[in-house]
């Protein structure tokens, strides 16, 4: 990390301000050359002109110097606040490169912060999640995680496991000495409690991931029941073609919209029916895949048409799902000839006239998901909690069987999974994978 890196830290495009960030051993040197200053006071905003090596002015800027180790990365950092737009920040960045800086890789500032002990990998993930959060509620959950509650809990569990492992491995070396029975009971209880905590974290995170990612909603029904009309009504604009011709929608259409504070990702699927049309068959297959991925299903039926075998197939398709289903009887403004043989609690509406009742029902359901409890949005961390929980649970059983070597193996597995997020580490390939999806300048 001896080189000095530079990047534009703000989004590209026209705006009032752009920020260019510089980090590394030569950051102060480059800043002094650009500004023609002889010194900079750390943490003080300095208004200055910036010049290129031909002594031509680049822009006027506010320049802030953060002296190591009291900076985001733990290195010397200089931030240039300049005028926004497409060109000025690029010109400044090119000048920094000509002075000897290197263009930063995606997430490299955060990676350096981790390597220099300024933050844990877990906090870095939380920062990235906060940047990408899609709703105010998601931001609230992630900001709460950043306060350290989750990190402290995971580190406490890891520390408990390390202490236990140290004792057990010592006991393996001195196998002739009997372990006190009450100590075995304490270890067993510790394993049970920590396994349960980790299981609660990953199950809660899985069940409420829609709060952070946005709830996926799939609209399903046979052809020509008004699925596309319902999609358009929910979006409040015409996104899908509405036609009396059955099979108009042959592919899945996905859009996002806000309902109250919740982000919804809604998918209009191709009508499900038997068809010899190859393209339509592919659309039906995609529809069934969308149902598997959805958090909520809107099952649409036509009030003006007699229930038939295609309707029955929809009922059969949804019979064993554990997803939340809203049963919708569309076109209820027309003569109602649909017989509710399945005794479903239908919401009666006309997608082309008024869907207020559906929106109210949806919002009431979404509001029932509170944001309390510890939740994580990183799939990698959710999997780590799951793997650790299961390993600790297996270890408890092995302890009861006095299989101490296998007990130690399972505990090691859990410790290593948790340590990836709670402890500093030097494995660059893991860091590269973790920060590869971060923004430039972050």
Curated annotation (Swiss-Prot):
Binds 1 potassium ion per subunit. One of its GO terms (biological process) is tRNA methylation. Homodimer. Heterotetramer of two MnmE and two MnmG subunits. It is an enzyme of class 3 (hydrolase). Mg(2+) binds at residues 228, 249. It is found in: Cytoplasm. Its EC number is 3.6.-.-. PANTHER family: TRNA MODIFICATION GTPASE GTPBP3 (PTHR42714), TRNA MODIFICATION GTPASE GTPBP3, MITOCHONDRIAL (PTHR42714:SF2). Belongs to the TRAFAC class TrmE-Era-EngA-EngB-Septin-like GTPase superfamily. TrmE GTPase family. InterPro entries: G_TrmE, GTP-bd, GTP-bd_TrmE_N, GTPase_MnmE, MnmE_dom2, MnmE_helical, P-loop_NTPase, Small_GTP-bd. Residues 214-367 form the TrmE-type G domain. NCBIfam families: mnmE_trmE_thdF, small_GTP. The keyword Ribonucleoprotein does not apply. It comes from Campylobacter jejuni (strain RM1221). Gene3D superfamilies: P-loop containing nucleotide triphosphate hydrolases, Probable tRNA modification gtpase trme, domain 1, tRNA modification GTPase MnmE domain 2. One of its GO terms (cellular component) is cytosol. K(+) binds at residues 224, 243, 245, 248. This is tRNA modification GTPase MnmE. (6S)-5-formyl-5,6,7,8-tetrahydrofolate binds at residues 21, 79, 118, 442. CDD domains: trmE, TrmE_N. GO terms for molecular function: GTP binding; GTPase activity; metal ion binding. Its cofactor is K(+). GTP binds at residues 224-229, 243-249, 268-271.
């Amino acid at each position: 990390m001896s080189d000095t890196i530079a990047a534009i830290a703000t989004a590209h495009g026209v705006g009032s301000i752009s920020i260019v960030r510089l980090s590394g051993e030569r950051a102060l040197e480059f800043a002094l050359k650009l500004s023609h200053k002889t010194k900079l006071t750390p943490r003080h905003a300095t208004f200055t002109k910036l010049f290129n090596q031909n002594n031509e002015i680049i822009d006027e800027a506010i320049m802030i110097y953060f002296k190591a180790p009291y900076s985001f990365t733990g290195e010397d950092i200089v931030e240039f606040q300049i005028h926004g737009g497409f060109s000025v920040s690029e010109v400044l960045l090119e000048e920094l490169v000509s002075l000897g800086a290197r263009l930063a890789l995606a997430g490299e500032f955060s990676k350096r912060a981790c390597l220099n002990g300024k933050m844990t990998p877990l906090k870095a993930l939380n920062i990235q999640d906060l940047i990408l959060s899609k709703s105010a509620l998601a931001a609230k959950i992630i900001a709460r995680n950043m306060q350290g509650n989750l990190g402290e809990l995971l580190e406490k569990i890891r520390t408990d496991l390390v202490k236990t492992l140290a004792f057990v491995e010592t006991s393996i070396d001195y196998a002739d000495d009997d372990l006190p029975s009450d100590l075995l009971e304490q270890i067993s209880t510790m394993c049970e409690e920590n396994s349960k905590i980790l299981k609660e974290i990953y199950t809660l995170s899985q069940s409420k991931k829609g709060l952070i990612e946005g709830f996926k909603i799939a609209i399903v029904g046979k052809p020509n029941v008004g699925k596309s009309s319902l999609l358009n009504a929910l979006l409040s604009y015409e996104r899908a073609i509405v036609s009396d011709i059955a099979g108009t929608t042959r592919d899945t259409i996905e859009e996002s919209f806000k309902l109250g504070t919740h982000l919804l990702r809604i998918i209009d699927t191709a009508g499900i029916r038997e068809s010899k049309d190859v393209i339509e068959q592919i659309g039906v297959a995609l529809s069934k895949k969308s149902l598997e991925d959805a958090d909520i299903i809107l099952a649409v039926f036509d009030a003006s048409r007699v229930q038939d075998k295609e309707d029955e197939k929809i009922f059969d398709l949804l019979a064993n799902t554990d997803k939340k289903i809203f049963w919708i009887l569309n076109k209820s403004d027309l003569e109602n000839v649909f017989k509710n043989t399945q005794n479903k609690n239908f919401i009666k509406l006309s997608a082309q006239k008024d869907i207020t009742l559906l929106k109210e029902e949806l919002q009431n359901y979404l509001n029932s998901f509170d944001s309390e409890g510890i939740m994580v949005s990183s799939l990698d961390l959710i999997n780590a909690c799951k793997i650790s929980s299961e390993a600790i649970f297996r270890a408890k059983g092995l302890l009861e069987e006095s299989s101490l070597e296998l007990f130690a193996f399972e505990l090691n597995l859990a410790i290593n999974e948790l340590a990836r997020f709670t402890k500093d580490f030097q494995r660059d390939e893991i860091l590269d994978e973790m920060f590869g999806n971060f923004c430039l300048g972050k």
